[in-house]
Structures are given as structure tokens and as C-alpha cells.
Amino acid sequence: EHSRLFIFCNNDDTEVFISSADFMTRNIDARVEVTCPIYDIEIKKDLIETFEIGWKANVKARLHSDKFENLYRKRGEEKPFRAQQEMYNHYQNKLEVITEIL
């Protein structure tokens, strides 16, 4: 699936947006898309954390080359980092905290 999270940074000023747009060329002219900023600090932090988990992936992770090739990321000596499992753990921990509060 295509990410619909946009993060723009300028020094300490970070802006986060969510969007329905995936910017696939086949969709640009045939759809109405919406993008909106995230103002809530906690939601913004959570979205950035989620994005960073994805960047760390090195198990079955793919990179898109400048030649539009869909290549596996080489892990080398790095410890395996399974982004989907880490994402599950991330939100499971948040759920436990929320459950304790309630």
C-alpha cells in the first residue's frame, strides 16, 4: 500500500499531513483527493514514530531505485528489524496503557 503520510521538516519546525492522495499517476486526473495538516502534538508524534518504524525495516523491505526497480534492501550485518511486528508491538503497548487508564 502507498503511504499517505507526509512529513516536512525545516530545522525544528515539523509539519505532518495525512492525505487520501497516493500520487500514483494513474489516479491524479480521475479522483478528488484531500490532504490535511495534523495540529495535535501527540497525534503528530505518534505518526512520526510510526513512520520511523517503517524506515527501520530490513526484513523483506524494498527499495525503489532511480531505474524504478523494486529491490530488496540488503541487511548486511544489521540485526533483523521486522517493521510489521514492531508496529504491532508499538500499538499493543499503547493499548495496554490506555486500558490501564480506563
What are these regions (language model features)?
Residues 1-102:
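PLD/PLD-like phosphodiesterase catalytic module centered on the HKD motif
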